[in-house]
Regions:
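Extended, low-polarity transmembrane helix blocks
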Residues: 1-33, 48-168, 184-195, 204-273
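Perimembrane loop-to-helix junctions flanking transmembrane segments
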Residues: 37-51, 176-186
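Short acidic alpha-helical/loop segments enriched in Asp/Glu that coordinate divalent cations
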Residues: 170-176
Length: 273
């Protein structure tokens, strides 16, 4: 894989990932979701107004996703970063146990951050925020930064989700596994939760391809349990968590590139010896 190929693939993986997160989240706003009411209440917004705001928020999310795919601007990506971060922060603010849901949402707010880093957001002028966002030029420094953020993202979302089973003991998880015939109970989801927490630490400390591929498969399967348990309408829960699948793919691309680069450099050195 050449640097140019990595650049293009990584760029599109992250764009599609961020867009899917917003499409899935936005769809629930358009449909309206009772589970959102505590978020509005935490900001002093009464339920009757919250129900009316949900479709507006949902439609805006979907519009941002379409713009990111069709006509991206850095200001749109910055909005997506801020909004995804805020909706993640709302979860502990609204009374969900601990901060596990915030960390589990790392796959929503860190992909936009990676897109901004790719596009040189730190060194931009004000007018650049509104200009077209073309495919960024990669270099070794950016590759290293993205490698770290991908590892961090995967670790956080695994540890956050693991906390649901290990500490919060969410009944939802029991229902998920029961939907595919696994006789799950509190002890079972405790064990799965600790497994995910340990897996998150391992990914951060030892990001090797077999482990990352396992994480990708694990997240696709376990997040699809929303659909097996709740029906096809919950496909939007699966789509909303696209960061759980897209970020491992991004890390796999980076590791493959770095491995091939190391092998290419090693050949001339061996010949010189």
């Amino acid at each position: 894989m050449t640097l140019e190929q990595l650049q293009t693939r990584l760029h599109w993986v992250l764009r599609i990932t961020a867009a899917c997160c917003f499409i899935g989240h936005g769809a629930w706003g358009v449909i309206t979701k009772e589970g959102w009411l505590p978020f509005f209440r935490s900001q002093g917004i009464p339920d009757d107004i919250a129900w009316k705001l949900m479709p507006i928020i949902g439609a805006l999310d979907i519009i941002m996703a379409i713009l990111l795919l069709m006509k991206p601007r850095r200001i749109i990506i910055m909005w997506m970063l801020i909004w995804a971060l805020w909706t993640a922060i709302l979860r502990p603010i609204s009374g969900t146990p601990g901060t596990w849901e915030f960390w589990e949402r790392a796959g929503n707010f860190l992909p936009p951050l990676m897109l901004l880093i790719l596009g040189g957001a730190i060194a931009m002028k004000w007018k650049d925020w509104f200009s077209g966002y073309t495919e960024p030029k990669m270099d070794d420094d950016k590759i290293g930064v993205l490698h770290f953020i991908c590892r961090l993202t995967i670790a956080l979302l695994l540890i956050g989700h693991g906390g649901f089973g290990a500490f919060v003991e969410k009944g939802m998880l029991i229902n998920h596994f029961s939907s595919i015939g696994i006789p799950a109970d509190v002890g079972f989801i405790n064990a799965v939760g600790w497994f995910e927490i340990i897996l998150g630490v391992v990914v951060f400390a030892l990001p090797i391809l077999p482990i990352i591929w396992f994480v990708f498969a694990w997240k696709v399967i376990t997040e699809f349990l929303y659909v097996t348990e709740g029906g096809i309408i919950n496909i939007f829960e699966f789509i909303e968590r696209w960061g759980d699948y897209g970020v491992p793919i991004a890390l796999i691309l980076i590791i493959n590139y770095q491995t091939r680069q190391s092998a290419t450099k090693a050949v001339p050195e061996a010949q010189a010896d």
